[in-house]
Amino acid sequence: MNEPTRTYLESEKDTQDQIEELQATCIVKNAAGIHVRPAGVIVRLFDGEPCDVHFTYAGKTINAKSIMSILMLGAPQGGEILVTIRSKEAHRILQKIQDAFSSGFGEL
């Protein structure tokens, strides 16, 4: 995984609580790739979080709060997923998903 890139959205630069857009590439470590159980972990991780989150893999970008969308990515072991998070708490939320990828979503 790499360091996140940070973008302040132009229309929000002057607000006290800035909305950030952070991106980082995460590697799928699970032998079976992202299947139903890891997809469920991802969706639960984002449940209630004040963010927009997207995964990009193989040229497809999806809403990462949708289990069906995550499954349709078909990301295999070793797949590099670009994670994009837009939130006032983007750094904290990105760290949570990076930790989940690092642990193989609890399967390693």
From Swiss-Prot:
PANTHER family, sorted: PHOSPHOCARRIER PROTEIN HPR, PHOSPHOCARRIER PROTEIN NPR
Record-stated family: Belongs to the HPr family.
Keyword Transport: yes
Cellular localisation: Cytoplasm
GO CC field: cytoplasm
Keyword Transport listed: yes
GO biological process, one term: phosphoenolpyruvate-dependent sugar phosphotransferase system
InterPro entries named among the record's database cross-references: HPr, HPr-like, HPr-like_sf, PTS_HPr_Ser_P_site
Gene3D superfamilies for this protein: HPr-like
Boundaries of every HPr domain copy: 21-108
Keywords: Cytoplasm, Phosphotransferase system, Sugar transport, Transport
Record's function text: General (non sugar-specific) component of the phosphoenolpyruvate-dependent sugar phosphotransferase system (sugar PTS). This major carbohydrate active-transport system catalyzes the phosphorylation of incoming sugar substrates concomitantly with their translocation across the cell membrane. The phosphoryl group from phosphoenolpyruvate (PEP) is transferred to the phosphoryl carrier protein HPr by enzyme I. Phospho-HPr then transfers it to the PTS EIIA domain.
Protein name: Phosphocarrier protein HPr
Active site (record annotation): 35 (pros-phosphohistidine intermediate)
